[in-house]
C-alpha cells in the first residue's frame, strides 16, 4: 500500500504550500464531512518511483476546547493516526512559539515518526534561526522552502526512509488471469449504499474468508467466489460483523478509499441516485482516472427517483463525469437486488479490457488506417509522421506510437486515435494511455 505522510503545524507556517509542492495539484480530495469548518485535504505525491499519499491539515492547536480550532485539532489528530510519517512544519522566520511546543508535546506522545521542517528558510542551511528549534526535541530541524522547493526532496526521502515501495505488477498471461482473483474496490461517499451492496453480495455468494482490519486505515479484504470466478473485495465501507450480517461503521476514511483504489484491479464507483453527482464523487472519480484503474459506475437507489429526476441525473453524469465516458454506467438497487447481474458482467468486461493483449501488427495497421483517414495537423511547415505502434503495458493499456515530429501531435488527435483503438478492440471500462516516441532517423549523422 502507498505510505501516508501527514503535514501538521500551527496556522500560517506554509503547510498548504508544501502540500501543493508535493502533489503538484490544487484539486485534492477533501474530507468534506458535514459540520466541519476546516477539512483534511488528500493528494498523491511521487518521488522517483515511490508513490505516497499526502494529508494537509488545518492550523493545529492541540489543547483547543471550543469552536473552529477544536474541530481543526480533531481533524489533525485523525490525520496523524492515519499517517506512516508526520512532517511537523514550523516557520523559521517567525521563530519558535508556544504553539510549536504544544504540538511537539502532542506528537511525541503519539510515538509516530516525525520530521521537523523549518519552512521559509530560503537560502538558509544552518545558523541561529534554526538552532532554537532543537528545543522542541524533534531532532534536527530541516531547512526547507515550500515556495521554492529548497530541501523538499531531502525531506520526503527521509520521510519515506525504510518504507519499501510496492512491487510493480507485471503483465499477466491468460492462464494467470483466469486463476488470479480480481481485486475489486467499492468506493463512494458515506451512506450511498456500499455496505448494503456488499451484504447483498456476501449473502448470495460463498464467503471464503473475512479478514478483520489491523488498524483504522487498513481496508478489509474479502475473498469470495461467484460461479467459477474468484474475486477479492477491497472494502472501504468499514464493515464489522454483527450476528450474521456486516454492519457499517459510520466512519468515512479518505485514506482507506485511496489505498483501496490503488490496490484494486477494478473500482466500482457507487453514486446515490437521490443525491446526484457531488463534488466528492467527481474527486474520487478523478483519482481513479489518475491511478489508471478500470472503473464501473453504479447508480444506486435508482428505483427511488422519478423519470424527471432520472433525466436530470443522467445529464449530470455526462457533464460532471465526462472524463470517465469510457466507463459503463449501470442503474441498480442494492436493497432490492436489482441490476446486479449486469453489474458483474460490466466488472468482468472492464478487467478483461484493462488486461487485454493488443498485437503489434493490429495496432500498427489501425494506426496507419487512422492516419490515412485523418492526418495530424501541421505545426508550421512540419506535419507529424506516425509510423508504427505497439503495446507498452496493461492495466491500463498503454499504446506506444513511434514517429517523427511527434511532439507536435495535439491532445485532440491523441483522443481521436484512442477512440479508434477502443472501437476496434472493444475496450470498455478502462483508461488508456497513449505515449508518443520519436523514431531514430539513421540518415541523420551525429555530427550534423
Swiss-Prot record:
GO terms for biological process: ribosome biogenesis. This is GTPase Der. It comes from Leptothrix cholodnii (strain ATCC 51168 / LMG 8142 / SP-6). GTP 2 binds at residues 188-195, 235-239, 300-303. GO terms for molecular function: ATP hydrolysis activity; GTP binding; ribosome binding. Belongs to the TRAFAC class TrmE-Era-EngA-EngB-Septin-like GTPase superfamily. EngA (Der) GTPase family. The keyword Nucleotide-binding applies. The keyword GTP-binding applies. Keywords: GTP-binding, Nucleotide-binding, Repeat, Ribosome biogenesis.
Amino acid at each position: 500500500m502507498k505510505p501516508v505522510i501527514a503535514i501538521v503545524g500551527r496556522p500560517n507556517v506554509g503547510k498548504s504550500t508544501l502540500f501543493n509542492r508535493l502533489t503538484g495539484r490544487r484539486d485534492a480530495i477533501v474530507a468534506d464531512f458535514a459540520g466541519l469548518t476546516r477539512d483534511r485535504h488528500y493528494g498523491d505525491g511521487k518521488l522517483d518511483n515511490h508513490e505516497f499519499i499526502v494529508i494537509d491539515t488545518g492550523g493545529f492547536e492541540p489543547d483547543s476546547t471550543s469552536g473552529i480550532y477544536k474541530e481543526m485539532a480533531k481533524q489533525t489528530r485523525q490525520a496523524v493516526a492515519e499517517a506512516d510519517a508526520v512532517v511537523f512544519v514550523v516557520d523559521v522566520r517567525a521563530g519558535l512559539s508556544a504553539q510549536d511546543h504544544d504540538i511537539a508535546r502532542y506528537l511525541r506522545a503519539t510515538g509516530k515518526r516525525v520530521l521537523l521542517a523549518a519552512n521559509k528558510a530560503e537560502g538558509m542551511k544552518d545558523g541561529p534561526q534554526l538552532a532554537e528549534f532543537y528545543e522542541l526535541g524533534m531532532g534536527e530541524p530541516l531547512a526547507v522552502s515550500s515556495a521554492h522547493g529548497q530541501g523538499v526532496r531531502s525531506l520526503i526521502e527521509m520521510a519515506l526512509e525504510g518504507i519499501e515501495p510496492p512491487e510493480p505488477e507485471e503483465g499477466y498471461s491468460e492462464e494467470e488471469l483466469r486463476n488470479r482473483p480480481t481485486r475489486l474496490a467499492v468506493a463512494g461517499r458515506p451512506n450511498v449504499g456500499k455496505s448494503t451492496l456488499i451484504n447483498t453480495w456476501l449473502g448470495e455468494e460463498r464467503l471464503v474468508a473475512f479478514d478483520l482490519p489491523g488498524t483504522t486505515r487498513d481496508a478489509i479484504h474479502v475473498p469470495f467466489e461467484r460461479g467459477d470466478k474468484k474475486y477479492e473485495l477491497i472494502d472501504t465501507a468499514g464493515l464489522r460483523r454483527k450476528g450474521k450480517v456486516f454492519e457499517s461503521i459510520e466512519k468515512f476514511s479518505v485514506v482507506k478509499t485511496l489505498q483501496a483504489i490503488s490496490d484494486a484491479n477494478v473500482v466500482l464507483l457507487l453514486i446515490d441516485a437521490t443525491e446526484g453527482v457531488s463534488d466528492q464523487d467527481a474527486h474520487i472519480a478523478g483519482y481513479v482516472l489518475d491511478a489508471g484503474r478500470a472503473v464501473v459506475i453504479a447508480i444506486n437507489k435508482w428505483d427511488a427517483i422519478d423519470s424527471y429526476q432520472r433525466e436530470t441525473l443522467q445529464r449530470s453524469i455526462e457533464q460532471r463525469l465526462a472524463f470517465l465516458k469510457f466507463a459503463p454506467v449501470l442503474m441498480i438497487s442494492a436493497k432490492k437486488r436489482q441490476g446486479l447481474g449486469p453489474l458483474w458482467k460490466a466488472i468482468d468486461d472492464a478487467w478483461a479490457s484493462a488486461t487485454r493483449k493488443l498485437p503489434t501488427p493490429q495496432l500498427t495497421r489501425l494506426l496507419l488506417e487512422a492516419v490515412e483517414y485523418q492526418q495530424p495537423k501541421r505545426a508550421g511547415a512540419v506535419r507529424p509522421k506516425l509510423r508504427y505502434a505497439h503495446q507498452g503495458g496493461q492495466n491500463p493499456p498503454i499504446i506506444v506510437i513511434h514517429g517523427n515530429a511527434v511532439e507536435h501531435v495535439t491532445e485532440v488527435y491523441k483522443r481521436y486515435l484512442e477512440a479508434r483503438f477502443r472501437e476496434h478492440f472493444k475496450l470498455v471500462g478502462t483508461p488508456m494511455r497513449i505515449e508518443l516516441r520519436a523514431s531514430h532517423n539513421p540518415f541523420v549523422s551525429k555530427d550534423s
